[in-house]
């Protein structure tokens, strides 16, 4: 039945309004779903980016620490050379006494045949107190190994404090001044997160050179022999008659420590 013209028009408008509202709700619902999807994707992207940054940070962290350690040690070496020169010029008698004490110590090792070398408790205690000679940081020099791209400060006495900072002369072996009938055992760990220390010692081959700098000079040594031993083979680092030597010592195999890796070097 046909309704009046006004009533039909009103119904049409109501139907049209209802359709527009439903369409508007659908569009709004679609927009909300799209926004939720965008927000979710954004959160996933941010979360993934954070994970990526954390992963990169973990991978780069040791390299960053090693870079800072290298910068720090280079600064220490410059300071060592400047301080040594200044103190030596200002008080040459003190440095002359230090040299004589080191020389006498080396000679005493020959006389007593390194009788305390088998005592593990003797290794950690420095035989000479550098503080008594005005060397407050305890650095006796430094070792440079070009093939390993390595420079480390050298301390007297292989205690944990010294070995956490660099390389150490093993007490009951020769002082770092060279000379006939000497063999300084230089020990270092296979590395920390902040410094590689002797981690790459296996890069050293026969004929490679290392350098030892003390308060007076820089000495050059050449790799002559490499050997893997057990920790109780202490005779392997004894002084060899008529030779001027440095023996590098570290744990082996990396990252374990049930053996010792020795690199024998002779003065050039």
Walk through the language-model features, giving the residues of each.
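Gram-positive cell-envelope targeting signals
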Residues: 1-75
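Solvent-exposed, non-transmembrane regions of membrane-associated and secreted proteins
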Residues: 41-45, 51-268
